[in-house]
A protein has these predicted regions:
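Extended alpha-helical targeting/anchoring segments
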Residues: 1-500
């Protein structure tokens, strides 16, 4: 626990000081914690990747104190706690001003995320950095950038069953430090009491056997004939030498009465992934389980994980191994993967120290719950004078969701795709108070706006692509998420299923 003496010492040097309380219990889960605090909770970040430090933790953000949102090509820093707003011309300036205003003492804890901005940057934000035409306006406006800086961060350690409550207390001249510390301790005690005394678990039950379905019942923004024709157009661009590859996508839609958190609870069970997230912004909810890192910046070290090449998981170890061998012998998949590794090297190379860029792992098989992929890891060391945000922008968006060469591919996609991509192909990320960044590519993700659910999926088109196969690939990818929607509706619309 943070003592008053420790708080007083830090309050003399910082504008925002973490007040921390930790306790152990084997009675709580992250889902219970979020449910108990659902009125204040705005995000949950999790991971199920054994090699990652993230897999030991779940992070829940409560009660935003500052948000950054893009509106009309301007960036609004909205200080929700102080009640004032600033307008700035760039995202980088908005973030740096926010860090300066908060001036946070970084918690001295061995956890991968120590507080900061959590949110998304949409694919369409690329028009702020590259000569890619802006996407047309849509009826439902979704900001290209939205970050939340929460007043309280809950950290759940899956291994030790320890829970940390980190409350970021802002020091000001209107109240004395004793009052600020006392109010912080009261807030922490209130949160702990609610966590430990919420005994209504009836809404948290899930069946042990999930009823699967093979139907596909989603509306698309693309007529099939146009999609097939656009695949041919991309192949013509490739033949003409404009590009090597482009990722053509279609967006699917359906209505649902289920909440985003209900969808997330089912998704985390049926499709555990390295990056799992539930984000809540006013009318928008984001639910996802992405397998692919966009960029990590950790103490000046850069890392990207290009993923390309997919096979289903085998029913037995023998079948699984056979499918993995087939994948590594597929010339089309290997060629695409090598191209994306080169893109990652170029992205990191623009912001890395000379000679520091290296491929630390090359074409290894990564196995997930339903599929396997070919994965590589590209690393580098951040160049002096280059900020972590500069590094992120250099890698954005991922080549795996755009194409190569990246800018020309995005220009062609903007010409062909009928609507804005919004979050699809962009990034879910945190920008830490400590300057670190971790981010994933926004794929295998659902967005929910006023009961309208959107799923988007793409296929990488190359010179020898078969249009029908590429179309079916997008259907297959979207079907995996539609299964989650169907299961969620089945479970929560018919609570009798819980008696199975």
């Amino acid at each position: 626990m943070t003592t008053y003496e420790e708080f007083l010492k830090d309050a003399g040097n910082y504008r925002t000081v973490p007040v921390i309380e930790s306790f152990s219990t084997d009675l709580l889960t992250p889902v219970q914690m979020f449910h108990s605090l659902k009125d204040e909770a705005v995000y949950m970040l999790e991971s199920q990747e054994p090699e990652s430090a993230w897999s030991n933790f779940s992070f829940i953000g409560l009660d935003p104190m500052v948000e950054i949102e893009e509106t009309g090509r301007q960036f609004i820093v909205n200080d929700l706690e102080r009640g004032d707003r600033l307008t700035l011309p760039t995202f980088k300036e908005a973030f740096e001003v926010t860090l300066g205003r908060l001036e946070v003492k970084i918690p001295d804890m061995d956890i991968p995320f120590k507080g900061g901005g959590v949110g998304y940057i949409s694919y369409d934000a690329i028009s702020d950095y590259e000569p890619v035409p802006r996407a047309p306006e849509e009826e439902v406006h979704i900001a290209n950038y939205h970050l939340l800086f929460c007043r309280t961060l809950l950290v759940y350690n899956h291994r030790s069953k320890e829970i940390h409550i980190i409350h970021f207390a802002r020091v000001d001249d209107d109240r004395d430090n004793a009052q600020i510390y006392e109010e912080s301790m009261e807030t922490i005690e209130h949160i702990r009491t609610r966590l430990l005394h919420d005994s209504d678990l009836s809404d948290l039950l899930l069946p042990t056997v999930l009823p699967m379905t093979s139907t596909f019942n989603l509306e698309s923004n693309y007529r099939k004939e146009k999609f097939l024709g656009d695949v041919e157009k991309i192949k013509n661009y490739i033949e003409a030498g404009d590009i090597l590859q482009a990722v053509l996508s279609q967006r699917f839609h359906k209505k649902t009465e289920r909440s985003g958190f209900e969808l997330y609870r089912v998704l985390r069970k049926v499709n555990p992934s390295p990056y799992m997230y539930y984000l809540k912004f006013n009318q928008l909810e984001v639910i996802g389980s992405s397998p692919e890192r966009q960029l990590e910046v950790q103490d000046g070290n850069l890392e990207i994980h290009p993923i390309a090449g997919t096979r289903k998981r085998g029913a037995t170890k023998e079948e699984d191994d056979r499918l993995a061998r087939e994948l590594l012998e597929d010339e089309k998949e290997i060629a695409e993967h090598r191209m994306l590794v080169d893109l990652a090297r170029n992205d990191i190379g623009r912001v890395a120290e000379y000679g520091s860029v290296a491929v630390s792992e090359y074409m290894v098989i990564g196995r997930f719950s339903r599929v396997m992929h070919i994965i590589s890891k590209v690393r580098g060391r951040l160049k002096a004078g280059v900020s972590p945000i500069d590094a992120f922008i250099s890698s954005f968006p991922a080549g795996t969701l755009s194409g190569a060469p990246k800018v020309r591919a995005m220009q062609i996609l903007r010409e062909l795709e009928p609507t804005a991509r919004n979050l699809y192909g962009g990034s879910i990320l945190y920008l830490g108070f400590d300057g670190n960044i971790d981010s994933c590519i926004t794929i295998r993700t659902m967005t929910l706006v006023d009961q309208n659910l959107y799923i988007q999926a793409g296929a990488g088109v190359v010179a020898d692509s078969d249009p029908e196969s590429e179309y079916q690939e997008t259907i297959n990818k979207a079907s995996a998420l539609e299964q989650t929607v169907h299961l969620t509706e089945k479970i929560f619309n018919d609570r009798n299923i819980l008696k199975v």
